[in-house]
């Protein structure tokens, strides 16, 4: 399975109509945690098991991984979790617009593809349009949590979110001040990075009270 796919290729630019929350979940009124780049899904599977009064959505651009995650989910009979294939920069906004305002409580972006070459920065997942879509759907005190073991990437991500007026950084200053995953569940990459004694940079943003305007 390829580690990286080019989200700007023609295939991934085709918008997908994602299933609505009422189709995805039996209890569609529950608060939602959205994990962008859910990879093998172990983080959300454990979290969904521990938090039955939340709904969890994992979005992943590598379709074989989505199939693998859905197979695991069905085996565990988790009805508060779904994994979906899509390019979030193309298909997320429409799906979020279907949610009740404020239902989206948490968004996590953990160890995304770094795309090191400057000419490939535009392939990185976090962009202004995604942040605005999230800001439009999220009410005050909603969360965006990001983490990476690559300083240049976390710096890029924090700079991008800092420029957005709808989110306020909770831990200003030291990017290492959050010493563990705030949801008390670790991703596979997080576990591997800790075993290698790599520094992990974690940042939490809070949706402020500014009303969203286009």
Curated annotation (Swiss-Prot):
Residue positions binding S-adenosyl-L-methionine: 35, 60, 87, 113
Swiss-Prot/TrEMBL keywords: Methyltransferase, S-adenosyl-L-methionine, Transferase, tRNA processing
Highest taxon of the lineage: Bacteria
Reactions accelerated catalytically: guanosine(46) in tRNA + S-adenosyl-L-methionine = N(7)-methylguanosine(46) in tRNA + S-adenosyl-L-homocysteine
Active site, UniProt feature: 113
Pathway: tRNA modification; N(7)-methylguanine-tRNA biosynthesis
Functional note: Catalyzes the formation of N(7)-methylguanine at position 46 (m7G46) in tRNA.
Protein name: tRNA (guanine-N(7)-)-methyltransferase
């Amino acid at each position: 399975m390829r580690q990286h796919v080019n989200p700007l290729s023609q295939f991934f630019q085709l918008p997908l109509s994602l299933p609505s929350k009422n189709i995805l979940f039996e209890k569609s009124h529950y608060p939602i945690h959205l994990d962008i780049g859910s990879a093998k899904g172990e983080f959300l599977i454990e979290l969904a098991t521990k938090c039955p009064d939340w709904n969890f959505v994992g979005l992943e651009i590598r379709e074989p991984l989505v199939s693998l995650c859905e197979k695991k989910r069905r085996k565990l009979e988790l009805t508060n979790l779904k994994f979906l294939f899509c390019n979030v920069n193309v298909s997320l906004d429409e799906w979020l617009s279907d949610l009740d305002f404020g239902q989206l409580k948490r968004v996590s972006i953990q160890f995304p593809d770094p795309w090191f070459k400057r000419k490939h920065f535009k392939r990185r997942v976090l962009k202004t349009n995604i942040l605005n879509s999230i800001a439009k759907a999220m009410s005050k005190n909603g969360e965006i949590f990001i983490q990476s073991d690559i300083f240049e990437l976390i710096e890029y991500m924090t700079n991008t979110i800092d420029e957005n007026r709808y989110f306020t950084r909770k831990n200003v200053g030291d990017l290492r001040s959050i010493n563990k995953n705030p949801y008390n569940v670790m991703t596979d990459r997080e576990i591997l990075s800790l075993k290698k004694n790599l520094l992990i940079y974690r940042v939490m943003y809070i949706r402020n009270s500014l009303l969203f305007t286009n």
